[in-house]
Amino acid sequence: MTSIRAASTWRAAKQALIAALCMNYAAMAAHAAPVSAPPGEVIAHSPAATRVYLGSPSLAVLPNGDYVASFDTFGPAAPQDRVSVFRSRDKGLTWSRLGDVPDQYWSSLFVLNGALYLMGTNRAMGTPSIRRSDNGGASWTTPADASTGLLSRAGRFITGPVPVLVDHGRVWRAYESVEDGDLRALVMSAPLDRDLLDARNWRVSAHLPSDKRWLDGKFLSWEEGNMVGRQHDTPVVMLRVNTANGREKAALVATRDEGRTLSFDPARDFVDLPGAGKKFTIRFDPQSKRYWTITNAVPDSAGRVNLERIRNTLVLLSSPDLRQWTAHRILLQHKDMKRHGFQYADWQFDGSDIIAVLRVAFDDQEGGAASQHDSNFITFLRVRQFRQNTGSQAPTQNLQ
């Protein structure tokens, strides 16, 4: 009997101890600092432990005012060559998944003549391809051959969710080809009134090689070119420039002969643009008569670092001529550079605002992003009244 009473007493004490520990843990959890959510509205999330990272965000506004966003995945466990499409019917506050598009990668959304298009490559280092949706992204055509959107070209091609431009009666998009260890700039264009799914309607420019001797030998490569329209002149391509070190620059490449040839003068066509060593989007605003972009500019306070991997600051800039750029606002910033990034902003004008989708590395309940590059979120961000007070809201931080 004595042993039974002792066991009973021990069980009661043990239960009381467990209850006390649970209450103590609950109290600690209640007072622990909550994990902050990334800025803006979350479209998609993939914890770092999945080894599936989210990239290549693109954004379009449908004729009825709804927003459509797309993105793809990368990383060791990521599904290959697949784009996910989401839609918002409430101006970006909430998002619903429309589905996945197989055999599509590094793609841009754009609207033309009431239809929604998705244009990129059919796989990483693949062939240019384009699809059309007549129901706002719920379903898509399939690029099976040259008459249905497979824009077959010899070689391997890279790109990103870069702007598709409508200008001079044509649709324009930039790509880069992988040739002899070089990324060569090129432009594809087609007449506005032709079937964009028919490869015969697309003109391809001559491929423009780069030269490692540029920028005193600091030039590495260029990529992710933006097609940009110019008033009273032919379109240009503004490319991201990767360098060994030094100030971040973009390359301004002119189109000639209705998109058949490209020209670039390294002595004058490298442009100082903070953040241009990472992917960016440039668009012209007829109201302000300025070109606008959102980049990962790097503050001076970061010191001497690899600028290409510093993505924790997002800055709004504009230019009257694509050559002289002014920083207006720091839109987002996090003090940590290694595991936080607001990057690959693709955006559209929406009245007095800019709306954007971002590839974001940020904190989550699973321990946060693996690195600033290996992003675990796709988010939506609204920049309100972007044209207002552009002269008085310059960042107080100097930019490299």
Task: Describe these PLM feature segments.
Residues 14-27:
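Bacterial N-terminal signal peptides
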